[in-house]
Every structure is written in structure tokens, then in C-alpha cells.
Amino acid sequence: MSSCMLFFTVIIAGVFMGTIATNYCNLKSCVNYGNIHTMCKYTSSTPASTCSKWEKAGLTDAEKKTIVTLHNQLRRKVAAGKETRGNPGPQPAAATMPDLTWDNELAMVAQRWANQCKYGHDACRNIERFQVGQNVAIRGSTGENLSTVDQMILSWYSEVDLMNKKYVSSFPKDDTYKKIGHYTQIVYGNTKTIGCGRIFYKDGKWNQQYLVCNYGPAGNYPNAPVYQIKQ
């Protein structure tokens, strides 16, 4: 490994609203908005030609466990009223915030999108059961990419530093959400499941690691509470 390495991290949070039928290609909310579901648009389960020199795709069972465990540790911390950070903080305790469980369908759709190596959000990712939110992160290195999934998740969560506690009762509808959306999706009270995908690939001098996590039901609805505050 080179003794001199460059690193960068870019993260995005978002949500796409709508419901879908079992047949991804017949999703009305996609068609109505001129969009195509990820599973319909990209039919191959192998990485696309846009992933130049991809090395490996997917997550190990241990990494999946880490993703779920870390999310739940963070959710429990906030729910218990132990998160003192914010702008201003502290973050209020939650009346209820269930633990997340791993969802294979969410993971399948997330991996399909990751396999395109197109940084950003896919146009339509919902499943029949619920609407789906999404956090996306990419981390690059000029040497060996040793970033871990927990580091990428913690980078999302670090947006709590910018979270005004008043937004817990009403998620902002202006561009403020771009600064806090990763954090709020992680702790969204109505979200119960998570599924993620990941790929390593080469982009010029950068060795990229691209992580996509899908959440259901989705969070980050304007003017709606992030979670119910404990009275």
C-alpha cells in the first residue's frame, strides 16, 4: 500500500414516495412519474459495464449483522434520550422506536442499484409492502480501500450535529433536509426494516467503495414527525 494516500467520502440521503405492485415493471407510481423501477430497468444481477474493473459486490453475513446492530444501537441511544448533540440539542427521547431487522428484498434492490456504479439515488425502489427510503455513501482511496460499513454508517449519523431538535416533531420541507436526512432516516420512528448492497470498483485513480442502504417504511416526509417524542 502506498505510504501517501488520498481519501474522500460523499454521502446522500433521500426518499422516493409511492407504492408498487409485485411486478416491478408495472409499478404505477413509477410510470406516472416517467420512472422505471430499478429491478425492471436493470435486469442483470451482475455489475454493469459502468463498473469499470469492479472487484467484488455484496456484503458478508458479518457485515449485514454489523449494519443492523449499529443502526439499532444508534436508534436505542436516541430513543433513550441519550443523544446530547444537535443544533441545538439534545435530541428528545422517543415514545417508541423499534429495532430494525434485515430485509432481503430491500437488500436485493439496493444491490441491484449499487451494481450500476452510478452515484446517487435510483428513481424508483419501492416494494409492494411499503415505500422505501435510501441512504447512499461512496468512499474512495488512491490506495487499498479499507473503509468499513460501520464507518460509513457513522458518517451518516454524524449529521446529528446539525439536527435542530425542533425538527423531530416536524421534518423540514426546505433544503435543510439535505444536511440532516441521513441521520433522520436512521432514527425514523416508523422505519422497521433495512437492506443494503455494496460494490468495490475502480474509477480512474480511485478505488471506490459504494454502499446503498434501503429503508422501509420510508422516512423523511415533510412536515411529519421524525419520531413520536416521549411525553
Curated annotation (Swiss-Prot):
Domain SCP: from-to ranges: 68-215
* Domain of life of the native organism: Eukaryota
- Secretion signal, residue range per the UniProt entry: 1-21
Pull one GO CC term from this UniProt entry: extracellular region
Q: Which Gene3D superfamilies match?
A: CAP
Which InterPro entries does the record cross-reference, listed alphabetically?
A: Allrgn_V5/Tpx1_CS, CAP_dom, CAP_sf, CRISP-related, P14a_insect, V5_allergen-like
**Which terms are listed as keywords in the entry?**
Allergen, Disulfide bond, Glycoprotein, Secreted, Signal
Q: Which Pfam families does this UniProt record tie to the protein? A: CAP
Q: In which tissues is it expressed?
A: Expressed by the venom gland.
Tell me where in or outside the cell this protein is found.
Answer: Secreted
Q: Which cysteines are joined by disulfide bonds?
A: C25-C40, C30-C124, C51-C117, C196-C213
* Glycan-bearing residues: N145
Stated family: Belongs to the CRISP family.
Q: What is this protein called?
A: Venom allergen 3 homolog
Species of provenance: Dinoponera quadriceps (South American ant)
